[in-house]
């Protein structure tokens, strides 16, 4: 695999590596699978992308599914909701007689749900695409679904196109934006074009002798909102940090070399907000009123641009960003690039975004 670290795919064998203990789960495919239960909506997106949504016979949390085709099949009684790992419908799962149930684990501890399924004779295969750090690493799981369904060639060609698109966008941006400068975009810049910016300190000149020739600086991004009293900042090597970096930004407070998020207080986030040009993914909030209502301290966060990945949220609360977004990181990257360009120019671009909205 080019990007995926927790997956190996052969012609008739798929090996998934558990990141918690290094154990391997193997799925051998001697013929295309005809009936699949998906415990994650991202699995549905991969099957949808290769035109195999019809093999899905069961899902976990139908209300959270974004796929229009899958929802239509659910409404028609062709797909069933099998519950959650904490409250599964074992009788329904067994009755569906799936060729495989695609699951996931969130720790090294043995899952009573998965153990029970195995004892009932249900074939289970665990996947960890949600723990891949590289956006293309998550998208590369389409190859596994291609092998499952006999559409490996299609899956390979789709992934090649996705990776090519993503890498071209990232390279164009990287060619323009590379080195740190202290000038804050969106607050102090007065031109739509930043190509004439000069190094802002002697430090810039020493660290980057070519800074005189560099154009735009990286957009400084505040991420997320607190859950309870804890605010989680993505690690510098995490999925979201890679997307933001490839789009020309940097996440404030992200720890370099780390994939895991780190916890900070709201007060610490407020200090970071003073440097921020943009605020991304503020939870469920779709307006500044929502933000102010969620935490009175947010009224003091004077960040010029706020965007959330909630454009494609279902009535049941599912978010397509975490469904089809896994298959289409190049679309997310385009959204972020458009947002960062808008931050520089001060223009509104909400209508041209696919996964994001502007929080006003």
Q: What does each model-found stretch correspond to?
A:
Residues 1-44, 154-183, 190-193, 210-222, ...:
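Bacterial Sec-exported substrate-binding components of ABC uptake systems
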Residues 3, 7-96, 100-107:
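A short, structured surface patch at a secondary-structure boundary
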Residues 42-43, 236-239, 332:
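Conserved alpha-helical elements of sugar-nucleotide-dependent glycosyltransferases
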Residues 45-46, 112, 335:
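Phosphate- and divalent-cation-binding pockets in alpha/beta enzyme and binding domains
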Residues 61-136, 140-143, 148-193, 213-326:
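Binding-cleft/active-site segments that stabilize strongly anionic ligands or cofactors
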Residues 300-360:
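Short hairpin/turn module used for nucleic-acid contact or packing/dimerization
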């Amino acid at each position: 695999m080019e990007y995926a670290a927790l997956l190996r795919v052969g012609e008739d064998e798929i090996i998934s590596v558990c990141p918690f203990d290094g154990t391997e789960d193997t799925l051998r495919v001697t013929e295309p699978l005809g009936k699949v239960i998906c415990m994650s909506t991202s699995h549905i997106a991969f099957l949808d992308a290769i035109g195999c949504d019809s093999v899905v016979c069961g899902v976990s949390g139908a209300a959270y599914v974004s796929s229009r085709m899958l929802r239509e099949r659910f409404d028609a009684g062709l797909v069933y909701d099998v519950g959650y790992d904490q409250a599964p419908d074992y009788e329904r799962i067994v009755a569906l007689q799936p060729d495989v149930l695609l699951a996931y684990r969130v720790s090294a501890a043995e899952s009573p749900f998965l153990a029970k399924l195995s004892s009932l004779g249900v074939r289970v295969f665990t996947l960890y695409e949600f723990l891949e750090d590289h956006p293309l690493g998550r998208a590369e799981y389409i190859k596994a679904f291609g092998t499952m369904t006999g559409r490996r060639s299609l899956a390979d060609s789709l992934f090649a196109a996705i990776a090519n698109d993503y890498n071209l966008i990232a390279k164009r941006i990287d060619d323009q934006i590379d080195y740190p400068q202290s000038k804050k975009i969106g607050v102090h810049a007065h031109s739509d074009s930043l190509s004439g910016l000069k190094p802002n300190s002697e430090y810039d000149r020493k660290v980057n002798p070519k800074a005189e020739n560099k154009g735009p600086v990286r957009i400084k991004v505040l991420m997320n909102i607190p859950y309870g009293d804890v605010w989680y900042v993505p690690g510098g090597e995490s999925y979201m940090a890679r997307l933001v970096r490839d789009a020309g930004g940097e996440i404030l407070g992200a720890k370099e070399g780390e994939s895991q998020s780190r916890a900070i207080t709201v007060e610490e986030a407020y200090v970071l907000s003073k440097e921020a040009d943009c605020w991304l993914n503020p939870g469920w909030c779709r307006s500044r009123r929502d933000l102010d209502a969620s935490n009175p301290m947010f009224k003091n966060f004077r960040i010029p641009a706020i965007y959330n990945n909630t454009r494609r949220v279902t009535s049941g609360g599912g978010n397509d960003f975490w469904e089809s977004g896994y298959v289409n990181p190049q679309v997310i990257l385009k959204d972020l690039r458009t947002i960062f360009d808008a931050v520089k120019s001060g223009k509104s671009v909400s209508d041209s975004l696919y996964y994001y909205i502007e929080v006003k």
